Amino acid sequence: MNIDMVGMGPFLEHADTPLFQFQDSLLPLNERFNLSLRMIAVLRIMMPDINIVATTALQSIAPMGREQGLKAGANVLMPNLTPGKYRGYYLLYENKPCIDEDADECLDCLANRVKMVGEEIRYSEFGDSKHYIERKNQEPGTKT
């Protein structure tokens, strides 16, 4: 498969959607969380050269959810750079983290979270996956 990046996380139902009526048919939140971590781990084993996102949905279930996603095999965190005054208008699910922070606070928070799992943000590097770089280097006319 020619995949550069995957973002996946637990399904979180929203009260204003048609699927909310089926919430009783879903796995409990903690099971969805654990399943998501296992999915990240399996995907990392299957595709070691792609980018995998530790989603904010993980953090909405567990305060350290994104960190657990990183430990399971994710290697990308996506900062919320939406201006603070607009964040409340874009709530895909309840308990969305960081809606009361501005962009600078969000970036500082992410840096601290990454350090907590023994990693560091590489500000001076592009975030292209190894798979993407290799694919681009193999295209005709591309310099290696």
Predicted segments, located by residue:
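Auxiliary Fe-S-binding modules of radical SAM enzymes
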Residues: N2-T144
